[in-house]
Amino acid sequence: MDRSAEFRKWKAQCLSKADLSRKGSVDEDVVELVQFLNMRDQFFTTSSCAGRILLLDRGINGFEVQKQNCCWLLVTHKLCVKDDVIVALKKANGDATLKFEPFVLHVQCRQLQDAQILHSMAIDSGFRNSGITVGKRGKTMLAVRSTHGLEVPLSHKGKLMVTEEYIDFLLNVANQKMEENKKRIERFYNCLQHALERETMTNLHPKIKEKNNSSYIHKKKRNPEKTRAQCITKESDEELENDDDDDLGINVTIFPEDY
């Protein structure tokens, strides 16, 4: 079986499976992005999370949903309010931790070149911890990730260790991260649409590719500092650089793993 046929087989099998996530469906903020990728011949998504704020209890088992020895006392993909956290904390028997987990997306790609397009758009959109994995069987996976998470302990052995004022402060930080996370998702989706439209036009009209390459070389000589994608504004760049300084300069990384 050739690679293209094998990829189509993998895609059909993956998209026909039931959603086994806790929620059981794709998060609202990434539905359009996921559908857009799955409609393309060269991609399909294997998992996603739009980002969430959650309160975990790592301690005595309670009646909440269990996962990896933790109780999920609260989880939301929207902005969170203090009253909900205070009520949820009353159920904690062990060590309760407030977390914000940013957007994550895993996409299997038909070829490495396809993954590189997504990777470039992810990096330019602020997801600077993104990477590509190539398996021994030829499976090429892209993980879209960032590092602007949050994890703060609130209680120990069921005893609250912080004030309500501090919880309110933490939620303001978490909510700001959630709002920035949503902006990055929208930026990634918009950049991806433009990039794939350009790729389609280039494939349909090979002469455009030659012309664009010549124009790019000419512009690069005139303005060597202008290297970022057109869809990212200067203001957005500064905002992202301030938030993810540790991730600047990440390039495509390929890890040989077996699937």
UniProtKB/Swiss-Prot annotation:
GO cellular component terms listed in the entry, alphabetical order: cytoplasm
SUPFAM superfamilies per record: SSo0622-like
Keywords carried by this UniProt record: Methyltransferase, Phosphoprotein, S-adenosyl-L-methionine, Transferase, tRNA processing
Enzyme kind, highest EC tier: transferase
EC nos: 2.1.1.282
Catalytic activity: 4-demethyl-7-[(3S)-3-amino-3-carboxypropyl]wyosine(37) in tRNA(Phe) + S-adenosyl-L-methionine = 7-[(3S)-3-amino-3-carboxypropyl]wyosine(37) in tRNA(Phe) + S-adenosyl-L-homocysteine + H(+)
Pfam family, one: TYW3
Biological process according to GO: tRNA methylation; wybutosine biosynthetic process
Residues recorded as bearing Phosphoserine in the entry: 25
Extent of the signal sequence: none
A single GO molecular function term of this UniProt record: tRNA methyltransferase activity
Pathway: tRNA modification; wybutosine-tRNA(Phe) biosynthesis
Described function: Probable S-adenosyl-L-methionine-dependent methyltransferase that acts as a component of the wybutosine biosynthesis pathway. Wybutosine is a hyper modified guanosine with a tricyclic base found at the 3'-position adjacent to the anticodon of eukaryotic phenylalanine tRNA.
Recorded family membership: Belongs to the TYW3 family.
Name of the molecule in the record: tRNA wybutosine-synthesizing protein 3 homolog
